[in-house]
């Protein structure tokens, strides 16, 4: 991508747990900082929709599907819906088999960054050491897209973000 990205509609895919979403906030901010006028949407799991809607760099948050493999008509409806949104670029931040399958559903005509063999912008594979930090992989993926990852993200909005709903009656918070 050049200094002025040609992408007007960008979809980020992040289906992991809450910690994965929090850890990827700097990457989401980098996309917004690089393309401030673009519509940036997120595809994520249902439990995190409410929280993700408070992320100031996102325009829309869409729920990811959890259909069974044999529910072909539902998968096709999902694919039709996502294709109708006409994204210029999809950035697969998850790079798991499920999101690689999404690439086939969305159609190969959309610019895609991720791990699918058909990607225009391949995400680097894990190198030695194998336990490479996920943010380092995102940093390399963003470099391939021409998106600077060195702008600090303002996270003050987190102090006012609503809790993840519904919280179970009993839960544990681990802070490292």
Predicted region positions:
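Catalytic machinery of carbohydrate-active enzymes
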Residues: 1-176
């Amino acid at each position: 991508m050049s200094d002025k990205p040609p992408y007007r509609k960008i979809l980020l895919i992040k289906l992991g747990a809450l910690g994965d979403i929090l850890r990827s906030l700097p990457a989401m901010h980098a996309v917004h900082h690089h393309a401030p006028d673009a519509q940036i949407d997120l595809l994520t799991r249902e439990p995190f929709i409410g929280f993700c809607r408070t992320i100031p760099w996102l325009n829309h948050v869409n729920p990811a599907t959890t259909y069974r493999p044999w529910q072909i008509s539902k998968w096709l409806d999902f694919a039709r819906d996502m294709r109708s949104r006409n994204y210029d670029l999809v950035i697969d931040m998850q790079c798991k088999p499920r999101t690689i399958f999404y690439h086939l559903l969305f159609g190969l005509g959309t610019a895609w960054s991720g791990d699918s063999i058909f990607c225009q912008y391949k995400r680097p594979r894990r190198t030695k050491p194998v336990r490479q930090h996920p943010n380092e992989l995102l940093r390399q993926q963003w470099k391939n897209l021409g998106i600077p990852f060195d702008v600090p993200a303002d996270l003050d909005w987190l102090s006012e973000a609503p809790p993840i709903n519904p919280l179970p009656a009993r839960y544990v918070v681990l802070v490292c």
